[in-house]
Structures are given as structure tokens and as C-alpha cells.
Amino acid sequence: MSQSPAHEGDRNAGALIAAVCICGPALVSLIGMAPAAALPAMAKHFDQNGDGAIIAQNIRTLPSIALIVASPISGFLGERFGRRNVLLASWALYVISGAAGLFAADAFSLVISRLILGAAGGALLTTSLALIGDYFGGHTRERVLGFGVAFASLVAAGALTAGGALVDAFGWRAPFALYLSGLPALIAAWFVIHPPHHTRTEENAAKAATGDWAPILRLWPLYALLVLSTIGMYTPAIQGPFLLSEQSAMSATAQGAIIAASSIVAIFAAALYGYIRRVLGLTSVLALVMASFGIGIMAMAGLPGAEKIFGSAIIGIGAGCAEATIASAIFLKSPDHVHGRALGLLVSALFLGQWLNPWVFAPVREAAGLSNAFWIIGAAFVVLCTALVAYRLVRGEKLDGPARSVS
């Protein structure tokens, strides 16, 4: 069972601030999910330029590159200049660059707008998570993290389903209109979010300037596990449409519904995360995450037709717990004054895995076919689950516990 520092148990800023904080992770999920159902149509549109499938997949995942770079920078800027300022600026860029996909004239302009969107999303997600750490503590913080992932999964499921319908009705550009939903979130953040502790912000800024990276470097195993987790959790959205198109004839709406099953299950898994953590330690939860990815990915390959929805749903168990688990571990294992940068690297790891997904699958698909690639990569996750279980049995729940003090 997790043990949080006693002083954190009383830190609870209330439901309104929690709601605004979790809007960031929720709408950042649109960066990858909004155009997911449009991938086959987008691939046909760009097929004359070369390999339409890889072009479409990379237009979907290219924001990850900017996000990977921008997230640690935004964490540092938040520590130096205040998280509220970074949050508001990132919301404005999110709305403008996201909706630009409605009008982009060619692949190049679409790529530029998607890169800007990725940078805005990285700053938005990093700052939102850091604000959760500022405003909440202990099990309350873990519940807020879980609810944030749940809301993100709800938005992602809605985006996948609505995106498929929009593609069928209006073409592949239509899902980019979903990014306009960031405008009311920007307005709400303007009125609700204010620095909770002015003196703490100033202290953090001074410490950030000293280049104190040692507590962050110790977290590298957590970042590596999150990269692998993200490869698994995004498999239905990135590879699923192509697997479904290869194995059966389905409309974009039907494909979107099957892929959305992962996000729907993730909603419930994430909403229950705070309760799961009262029973299971972090290593045990990570083993559960890897098992769900492995079994779910293999089930998507092995089950026929619409029954693939069960594989997608199993993947949702891990998708609902992975991000909150790693974030909880980082809050516990790093001191307050590095949380901005530590969470920035968390976001970088999260989207590095998303960007790597097509490149991990590509050589396996070329060598063995897409269906066999699902089997092979799914089996690799099962092996990783077994390794985590063995580690848990030998070493115990070493990830649980408060951060070590750093002078």
C-alpha cells in the first residue's frame, strides 16, 4: 500500500480547481486521437506523394516530436516565470494551431501546424500536471490524477467516434474542428488558476536556476517504462485502423467505435485508480499495465471482425493506469522544486512512445505482416509483465514511499 508524506494529506484545493487542471490532459488527448479515424482517408489523399500510410501516420504523430522537446522546457519556464502564464499561453497556441488543420493547403503546412500544436500540448500537459502537484497531495492527488486520465479517455473516446462520423460525412479534414474545444478551457483557466503559493514559486525558481538535475536523473527507469507503455496504449489508435482495413471491410465509423473501446475502458480504470493504489503498490500496477497491453494486442490480432473490440478494451485497462502510475511515482520520488522539469520529461516520454509506435511496428510488419506484428509485440509486453512480477517478488514495492530529501 502506498504511503504518502503526512503533510500532503491535507492539501486539497477543491473540485473547481481540480476540474480546470484535468482539462489540460483531457484536451491534449485530442492531439493524437482527433485525426485517428481519418488515417486511411488521409493516406489515400497523400498517396501520390509516396507511401501514403506512413505520411498519414506521421502527420498524426509528428506533434510528439515538438511535444518531447517543449515539455521539459515548459517545466523549467513554469518554475521560473509561473505556471499560470505558461498555461494560458499554451491554451491559446493549442486552439490556433489545432484548428489550422481545417485549412492547411498541403502536407508541409499541415506538418508545421501540427508541430506547433505539439509544443503547445507539451506545455499544457506539463503545466497541468505540475499544478495538480501544487494544489493537491497524498491520496487526493492520486484520485485527481486518475480522474484526469479518465476524463482524457472520455474525450479520446468521443473524439474517435465523432471523428469517424465527421470523416464519413465531411472528409478527412473535419476532425480538426475538435481542437476549438480548447477555447472555453482557456477562458476558465484565466479566471480560476492563480499561483497557490507565491513564496514557493519564487523558491522553486531560484532552485531551478542552480541546475539541480540529480533527483531527475534517478527517475530514468520510470521514463523508460512509460515510453514502452505508450507504445502499447496507442497501438489501437495508430495500428488498429490498418489492421481492421486489412482483415475486414469496415466503415470509418465502425473502426472508430472498435478503437474507442480502449478509451472507454480506460475511463473506468483511471477513475478507479485512486482506489487501486490503496490496494496495489506501484510495481504491481505496472505489471498489470504490461499484462493488459500484451494480452489486448494479441487479442486484436487473433479475434475475428468486430470481436477485436475485446482486445481493444483489454488494452484500455493499462491505458487508464499507466500515466497516473508513473506520475504518482515521480511525485513520490522527486522533491518539490524539480517537479516541473520531472513532469516535463514524463510528458516527453509519454509522447516519445506514441511517435515511436509506427517505427517499432514497421520493421516487424515488413518482415512478418501486420497481424503477426501484433502477436510478436504483444508477446514482448507479456515478457515485460513477467519481469516486473519477478522484480516485485524479489525486491518488494520499492517504488512506493516519499521522496528522499535532497540538500
Where in the sequence are the language-model features?
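Extracytoplasmic
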Residues: 16-47, 236-241
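Extracellular/periplasmic helix-loop-helix junction of adjacent transmembrane segments
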Residues: 39-68
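Helix-to-loop junctions at the C-terminal end of transmembrane segments
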Residues: 70-82, 269-281, 365
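Cytoplasmic helix-loop-helix junction between adjacent transmembrane helices
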Residues: 113-152
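Helix-loop-helix hairpin linking two adjacent transmembrane segments in secondary transporters
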Residues: 139, 147-194
